[in-house]
């Protein structure tokens, strides 16, 4: 069992593993959880990785444990994964703060991630999810939509707002650009959570994330926006909670009227950023929901309009038991 750390990062599923590989060397307290050995990379070790195996029937009807992934089947993934979550959380215990990284469009990550978040939040831990919505296929779109609903379910069950930092895989945007944005967010969160800044302690971070404990607000899914200047932060509609970091205290200017605001001052000799703002709001979740709905409507129209061809078989053709046909 690992000891308590300041920030634990959990990389879940295939997308999580790929991000974790890119993030290697930036933070040491990381771990990986998946259902497929095919997603393992050179930085995975027995100490930092758990691969959940499923009972699989072979051709001779014998059963065998195999780690071959879940084929984007979220229901099957949930049936396999749910019983393992307490043991995973025990093996990789929560840090003072926690980041969980996964895709919404697959199966393993989109079930491991929210299940782990639910478990940790029910233990009172501070958790932020960094998630990737996907529109590239019908099943990825349906899984992303189901994941968004799952986040609301996790909020309801844990009685803690589920905080997501949201990214999208969409046409015209290279995967490398999406990955780079995620890496910037992870670096920023690790800095925010490192407990090294003047006037910003762990309780300040806890109050920022668990704003619902001090204000009469709905316990729902909320979105975290990571902003690198004041104008960007001010553009976020209806902010609920803001944490800000400055390397120059004289740059500290009120951004907006919010329920919770906490500010810290980072060492300018150690960090080269001017300011960072971590803005939580709820209204942006509605934008995500609408985009997913619009995409599903487009997908349904495309399926309905898909041309169907006539079979090459006619009523007189006879197929063998193997499907062979002789003209």
From Swiss-Prot:
Keywords: GTP-binding, Host cytoplasm, Hydrolase, Nucleotide-binding. The keyword Nucleotide-binding applies. Its main location: host cell. It is found in: Host cytoplasm. The record marks 201, 204 as: GTP hydrolysis. Residues 318-327 have a biased composition (Polar residues). GTP binds at residues 14-15, 107-109. Residues 303-327 are annotated as: Disordered. Homomultimer. Polymerizes in a strictly GTP-dependent manner. Belongs to the FtsZ family. PhuZ subfamily. Consists of two domains: a nucleotide-binding N-terminus that hydrolyzes GTP and a C-terminus domain necessary for polymerization. The domains are bridged by a long, central helix. Interactions between the C-terminus and the following monomer drive polymerization. This is Phage tubulin-like protein. It comes from Pseudomonas phage phiKZ.
